Amino acid sequence: MNDSQDTNQDPASLYQLGERYNKGEGVSQDHQEAFKLFKISAEQGYSEAQSSLGIMYAEGIGVKKNYIEAIKWFISSAKQKNSSGEYYLGTMYASGFGVDENLQEAIKWYKLSGGEGNIKAQYELGEAYLKGKGVLQDYEEAVKWYLLAANEGDMKSQAKLGYIY
């Protein structure tokens, strides 16, 4: 596929093709090609591609690690209520990568993501409430979030519930 064809394609199709290259499904794994496809799709406003592009920048997959670019793409994705973008934006605030560490801001994004069913965010909220990180310690609230994730098969949340009880 050449660049002129890439830019004229549907952003969802570009994203799906990028996922195939990223995972090596039906094609040889090629992170740089995945990055290129995600970027074209993301620039067209496709929130899943924006989140995936943010992950690639944050982890240095197919591109040089760049937390500032990662944050930019996570914000673009999160503004469209993409639960993955919200989760990863929360993670950046929790870790202080690319932004000042801000646990309250991380919790805000985790709640948005977790409320939309993101299991990773639900687990992180369970952890936050269990340990009192960024929120007041609240075992009932911790159990609530762990249960949401555990009911979707999250083994870490299931283990935490076993620990609590």
Locations of regions flagged by a protein language model:
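TPR-adjacent "capping" and linker segments in tetratricopeptide-repeat scaffold/adaptor proteins
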Residues: 1-12
